[in-house]
């Protein structure tokens, strides 16, 4: 009897504001994008403090150096060659030293675009600040070698995220270490602008004494609109409240309870800009926010408003701001960031008497520089070792407590996807996949993004010749025309657990194992988590109960005595260790499915002997 054999391995995609892509935050954690085969035989993945354990061993080769998920060791293998890490801009010494403990570090500054392309082809990781442009051409030049880009800071507009995603490269940033520094600089600009500090300083140094010219405005009782209530915006609001200001904010993604806790009202964009005396910008630069402060926006503002920007230069139309300053709509502006950096010395905006400028100093404190260096070094080193990254910007992110709870279900989801596609004749003709989550929880209480990502990864890996991980699995799936739909069914079980079961169906394809075909005619498998371990609980219409570990042999057979013994003897004679067996049947003494878990991969002769058992109608060998 012929037998079928497939194999597979272990990750999906995405970043906040008026666009639907949320920005990174330390409040979120992301499943690791990859494990490095060159540096790790296997790794235990931790979800914050909880362990994410998987069971796949990986093969160490120079050409296929990055793994997916593996698990018998907590550490990368120090006897193997170290990863090569390219740093193209000045990084704090503490961060560089940390990187040197883990890899071979090449600090090459002021590289030309061509030199950068040559360097990345020999690098496993790249760390940049805001000056290096990591373009699509850079990722193409890397030829799949580059596995993580670290942005030492918050903004990632100098990194082509789409290209990174397509090439399976994780992008991480360092959003927390410079939060206080940026907020303090915003407040410093606000206060110095209100009291004309920079202009008065220049006046005195020019030999003048113009007290009456530089009468300022008080901050107490004034309204500050914080445009973007993320980490920096929150800290600015906190400090402004301490100065006696009334603070309002606009941010479509900010939790209302967090704003209320600080005494901040969340309002609409137009309400914020039309009622504020001071407007402080803290949103990311996205297609939706590019030049969002323009002639139309300024026309809606209160006459005499004062503007502060320590976020990204591109959110302001600089020519429109000059017109607003000349018209007196904007009384003053204090800017730390610009559309082009450094700006032209002839810029009308820079030379305007009512504008205070600094050369992108938001994160420029000794403490912040060291903190950013350490944060990005830890993120990059951790990503190369396969650890969780709380600051990934192009992979699915969920709250840490949610990830901790979902950990065993994430492993289950990937394995179900992997099994399902192996049962679909090696993926031939696979186009439509349906995923059904059964849960006792309300729809809003179940975040399935990571589960979907892992199922997608499990399905795509065996049928793609591309490097596939959680970062690019959805992209590759779309390229292949795969349609993945999700359904949720409320069941009467304990809401203590997020998911009762996950069912993966591959629609309208032939199966190399007829026993996996449901009554509806689709390949269908279902699994649950039992005592923290993923279990396969249903194949087609047959109920089974097997732990998803090692490898799996599925046999469709006549339901008769002695079958377990016959197959067990064949495997035992070939020194193949059986770690579990389970038999499921629909009608007594009719048909049954036997699921056999084995530690080793049986050779072809052993599998042929199993297929030769007269009562076995078909079987398939599957790698988990």
Curated annotation (Swiss-Prot):
Catalytic residue positions: 312, 341, 360 (proton donor)
Keyword Chloroplast among record annotations: yes
Induction behaviour: Not regulated by high CO(2) levels. Up-regulated upon necrotrophic pathogen infection.
Residues modified as Phosphoserine: 71
Residue intervals of the ACT domain: 552-624
GO molecular function: NAD binding; phosphoglycerate dehydrogenase activity
Pfam families noted in UniProt: 2-Hacid_dh (PF00389), 2-Hacid_dh_C (PF02826), ACT (PF01842), PGDH_inter (PF19304)
Subcellular locations according to the entry: Plastid, Chloroplast
Null allele phenotype: No visible phenotype.
Tissue specificity statement from the Swiss-Prot or TrEMBL entry: Ubiquitous, but highly expressed in roots and in dark-grown leaf tissues. Expressed in the vasculature, stigma, anther filaments and shoot apical meristem. Not detected in the root meristem or in embryo.
NCBIfam families (alphabetical): PGDH
Listed name of the protein: D-3-phosphoglycerate dehydrogenase 2, chloroplastic
The species this protein was found in: Arabidopsis thaliana
Gene: PGDH2
């Amino acid at each position: 009897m012929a037998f079928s054999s497939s194999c597979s391995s272990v990750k999906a995609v995405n970043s906040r504001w008026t666009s639907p892509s949320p920005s990174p935050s330390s409040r979120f954690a992301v499943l690791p994008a990859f494990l490095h085969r060159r540096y790790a035989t296997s790794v235990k993945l931790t979800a914050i403090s909880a362990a994410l354990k998987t069971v796949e061993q990986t093969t160490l080769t120079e050409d296929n150096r990055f793994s997916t998920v593996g698990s018998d060791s907590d550490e990368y293998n120090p006897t193997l060659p170290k990863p090569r890490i390219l740093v193209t801009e000045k990084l704090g010494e503490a961060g560089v030293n940390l990187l040197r403990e883990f890899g071979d570090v090449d600090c090459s500054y002021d590289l030309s675009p061509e030199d950068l392309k040559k360097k990345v082809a020999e690098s496993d990781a790249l760390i940049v600040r805001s000056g290096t442009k990591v373009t699509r051409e850079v990722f193409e030049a890397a030829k799949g070698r580059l596995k993580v880009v670290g942005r030492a800071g918050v903004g990632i507009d100098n990194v082509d995220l789409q290209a990174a995603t397509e090439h399976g490269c994780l992008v991480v940033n360092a959003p927390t270490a410079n939060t206080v520094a940026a907020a303090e600089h915003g407040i410093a600009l606000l206060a110095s602008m209100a009291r004309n500090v920079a202009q008065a300083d220049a006046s005195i140094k020019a030999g003048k004494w113009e007290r009456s010219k530089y009468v300022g405005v008080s901050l107490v009782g004034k309204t500050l609109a914080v445009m973007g209530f993320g980490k920096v915006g929150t800290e600015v609001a906190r400090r402004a409240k301490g100065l006696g200001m009334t603070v309002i904010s606009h941010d479509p993604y900010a939790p209302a309870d967090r704003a209320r806790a600080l005494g901040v009202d969340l309002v609409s964009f137009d309400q914020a800009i039309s009622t504020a005396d001071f407007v402080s910008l803290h949103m990311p630069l996205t297609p939706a926010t590019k030049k969002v402060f323009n002639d139309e926006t300024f026309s809606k503002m209160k006459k005499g408003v004062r503007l502060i920007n320590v976020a990204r230069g591109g959110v302001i139309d600089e020519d429109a701001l000059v017109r607003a300053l000349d018209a007196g709509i904007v009384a003053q502006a204090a800017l730390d960031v610009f559309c082009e950096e450094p700006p032209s010395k002839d810029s009308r905006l820079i030379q305007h008497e009512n504008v205070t400028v600094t050369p992108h100093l938001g994160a420029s404190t000794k403490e912040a520089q060291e903190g950013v260096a350490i944060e990005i070094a830890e993120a990059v080193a951790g990503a190369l070792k396969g650890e969780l990254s709380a600051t990934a910007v192009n992979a699915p992110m969920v709250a840490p407590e949610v990830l901790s709870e979902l950990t065993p279900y994430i492993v289950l989801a990937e394995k179900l996807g992997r099994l399902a596609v192996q049962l679909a004749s090696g993926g031939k003709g696979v186009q439509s996949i349906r995923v059904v989550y059964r849960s006792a929880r309300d729809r809003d209480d179940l975040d399935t993004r990571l589960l979907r990502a892992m199922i997608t990864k499990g399905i795509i890996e065996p049928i793609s010749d591309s490097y596939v991980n959680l970062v690019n699995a959805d992209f590759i799936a779309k390229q292949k025309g795969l349609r993945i739909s999700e359904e949720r069914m409320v069941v009467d079980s304990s809401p203590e657990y997020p998911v009762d079961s996950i069912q993966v169906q591959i629609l309208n394809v032939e199966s190399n194992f007829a026993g996996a075909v449901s009554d509806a005619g689709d390949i269908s498998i279902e699994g649950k988590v039992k005592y923290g371990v993923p279990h396969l609980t249903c194949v087609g219409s047959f109920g089974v109960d097997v732990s998803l570990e090692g490898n799996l042999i599925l046999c469709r057979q006549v339901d008769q005595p002695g079958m377990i013994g016959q197959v067990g003897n064949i495997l035992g004679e070939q020194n193949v260790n059986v770690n579990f067996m389970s038999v499921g049947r629909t009608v007594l003494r009719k048909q049954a499915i036997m699921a056999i878990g084995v530690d080793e991969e049986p050779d072809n002769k052993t599998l042929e002997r199993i297929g030769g058992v007269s009562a076995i109608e078909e079987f398939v060998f599957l790698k988990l």
